[in-house]
Structures are given as structure tokens and as C-alpha cells.
């Protein structure tokens, strides 16, 4: 069994962004992009200013320093997107600092635990790796219950509800 216990500062490798699926009928969509709201994205760079409002005239309330960090887009205004992180902090960022590449944070609500990455989409398959809470993983696909994830030195499946960056039951292709 390969044991991969990664530190929270590890970032997942870059991957090409897929075009999001059209929103289901009746779902809220952004007035600028026409994409579903809310939706997940990730930070494109290692330094992203989170602002109080949608312009550079608004004060910076936080600076993210972690490329690949998943965030939830909750609103759109011109070139600005209102986002929320896994801890509930909200603010506005330039759209160019966001990527459609799907990433997830392992076990964000359970900070002191390690989580199994299995060789198949079942708890009965071999454990391929163990990841500490806070590790960022790239999401290849999800079937609504399990996600195929990968990162530096590992690839396998995780229970979807152990990831922040995909909605419960969401299918990702």
C-alpha cells in the first residue's frame, strides 16, 4: 500500500479547465457568464486579493496565497466574482484570477483526520493513499457518490462528501 500523507500546503498540478455543463432548468445563472450560480472554481495564482466590494477601490479584506484553492462563486458583477472559501469568508475577486479547473479541499470540516484514497469507487477496494485534511486535490470526475482525484504522487477515489469543492450528489465529467 502506498502511503501518501501530504501537507496542507501542497498544491495540485495544473490541468486544463473543462467547459461546465449547462445549468439544470430553473437553476440560477450568472448575469454575466450565464453559468450556474453558485458554482465551484479555483484560484489561478498564488496571490489573490479578496475585496470588500466589486472594484479595486474597495479595501482588500484578505489575501489568498494558495493557487488551486477551491472557492465557490456566489455572484457576478461585470469583471468581478463574489466568492466564498471553505471557512465561509466572502468577498470579491477579479474573474481573471479564477480558473474553471475543478479542485477540492480534503476534509475541510475535519481538520485533524486523514482520509483514504481508494483504488476504485468503493470502500471495499484497496487503499491507494491517505491524505491529511486541508490537502488540495484535482478533481477528474465525480459520479455523485465518489470522485476520481489526483495530485502529486497519487490518484484514486474519495467519498464525495469528504471533499469541499464539489456539491453533494454533483456529477463532474
What would you call each of these model-derived segments?
Residues 1-10:
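Bacterial N-terminal signal peptides
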Residues 12-16:
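Sec/Tat signal peptide C-region and signal peptidase I cleavage site
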Residues 58-60:
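Beta-strand-rich domains and repeat architectures in extracellular enzymes and scaffolds
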Residues 17-52, 63-67, 74-77, 84-86, ...:
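SH3-family beta-barrel domains
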